[in-house]
């Protein structure tokens, strides 16, 4: 299988997000990389599902709480930017303060 660099990045994000999801389900608090992967993958999937940019931006703030992540992680993530594929093309989505 031959993948483009972008496809490899998406696959890596998905794999890291899957690991984060499993750890969260076991009651573990997510660290910085797990948190980024979890939110990024969810945003990409929401865009793929046909949500608007505004809906995806709002959705990004509802995924995790401070109780879901390790201490200090929310302060390390002032915003997340993701290039997501929407039905009408690829767009840059920015979520400010993803962990309220």
Swiss-Prot record:
The keyword Hydrolase applies. Signal peptide: none annotated. It catalyses: urea + 2 H2O + H(+) = hydrogencarbonate + 2 NH4(+). Pfam families: Urease_gamma. GO terms for cellular component: cytoplasm. Keywords: Cytoplasm, Hydrolase. Its main location: cytoplasm. GO terms for molecular function: nickel cation binding; urease activity. GO terms for biological process: urea catabolic process. It is found in: Cytoplasm. Pathway: Nitrogen metabolism; urea degradation; CO(2) and NH(3) from urea (urease route): step 1/1. Disulfide bonds: none annotated. Its EC number is 3.5.1.5. Belongs to the urease gamma subunit family. Heterotrimer of UreA (gamma), UreB (beta) and UreC (alpha) subunits. Three heterotrimers associate to form the active enzyme. This is Urease subunit gamma. It comes from Burkholderia thailandensis (strain ATCC 700388 / DSM 13276 / CCUG 48851 / CIP 106301 / E264).
